[in-house]
Amino acid sequence: MSSFFVAGTDTNVGKTTAARAMIQALQGQGVQVVGYKPIACCGEESIYPVAQSENTSDYDHFVNADVLTLMHSTKENVSYQDINSYTFSHCAPMLTQDKMRIKLDKINCDLTRLNQTYQSVVVEGSFGLMTPMAEGKSFADWIAQQKMPVVLVVGIKDGCVNHALLTVKVIQQLGVPLLGWIANRINPLLSHYAEIVDLLVEHIDAPLLGKIPYLHKPEEQELGHYLTNIDRLMYMQTEFIK
């Protein structure tokens, strides 16, 4: 059993797309794998209201598009509530009193339950790695406590090299393994895409797991084949967390 944490260099860099690719790639190797997004929060474009009797989130009566994508990416029979601990209708509970509702004990229990049920859990964070999570701790603090290996998603755009290298430095300071990184093309008009990826390959001391091109509705597509270094994930699954 193992968990991987999918960290992004920023918000809207494609963490959910990369998590879907990881889930599909691992399933292609026969691994029983699910996604897990502890805290889901976003704007109007990615939440959907549900009737109160159908509410699957802990507090607000909404479901989140990222959690739905994770739910529909796995072949395992999971519900929305199985793979999400908290859903909020606004973009950042850490900026409001809602942050007081988030309890790490619940998140830890939910992750333990998934780890005990499935061979692998792909955990998707919210916003960036240093974003406050709950009870005075950041996502970085939490994954260090969990000793959870990290896969870094880099949304390839101007400025991403600085963001990526700073995030890598934080991961190294945490003392958790950086399994590798995924290049996600989020700007189809970026003329120097290849040069940026080459520069990141040169400076990130971890393997490139794959390159996901700019895609229309990636949440509806097969993405696993874009991860060309899946052996790295399979190896780490057995080496780091049993």
Swiss-Prot record:
Main localisation: cytoplasm
Tell me the leader sequence span.
none
Q: Where is the protein found, in the record's own terms?
A: Cytoplasm
What does the record give under GO molecular function?
ATP binding; dethiobiotin synthase activity; magnesium ion binding
Active site residues of this protein: 37
| Alphabetical UniProt keywords | ATP-binding, Biotin biosynthesis, Cytoplasm, Ligase, Magnesium, Metal-binding, Nucleotide-binding
Recorded metabolic or biological pathway in which this protein acts: Cofactor biosynthesis; biotin biosynthesis; biotin from 7,8-diaminononanoate: step 1/2
Q: Which GO terms describe its cellular component?
A: cytosol
| Gene Ontology BP, a term | biotin biosynthetic process
**Residues annotated for ATP binding in this entry:** 12-17, 66, 184-185, 213-215, 220
Reaction it catalyzes = (7R,8S)-7,8-diammoniononanoate + CO2 + ATP = (4R,5S)-dethiobiotin + ADP + phosphate + 3 H(+)
The cofactors named for this UniProt entry are: Mg(2+)
| Superkingdom as given in the UniProt entry | Bacteria
Keyword hit for Cytoplasm: yes
EC number, as in UniProt? 6.3.3.3
Claim: Transferase is one of the keywords in the record: no
UniProt-listed InterPro entries: DTB_synth_BioD, P-loop_NTPase
Which Gene3D superfamilies does the entry link to? P-loop containing nucleotide triphosphate hydrolases
In this chain, Mg(2+) is annotated as bound at 16, 66, 124
The annotated subunit structure for this chain is: Homodimer.
Q: What does this protein do?
A: Catalyzes a mechanistically unusual reaction, the ATP-dependent insertion of CO2 between the N7 and N8 nitrogen atoms of 7,8-diaminopelargonic acid (DAPA, also called 7,8-diammoniononanoate) to form a ureido ring.
**The family this protein is said to belong to:** Belongs to the dethiobiotin synthetase family.
Q: What is this protein called?
A: ATP-dependent dethiobiotin synthetase BioD 1
Q: Which organism is it from?
A: Haemophilus influenzae (strain ATCC 51907 / DSM 11121 / KW20 / Rd)
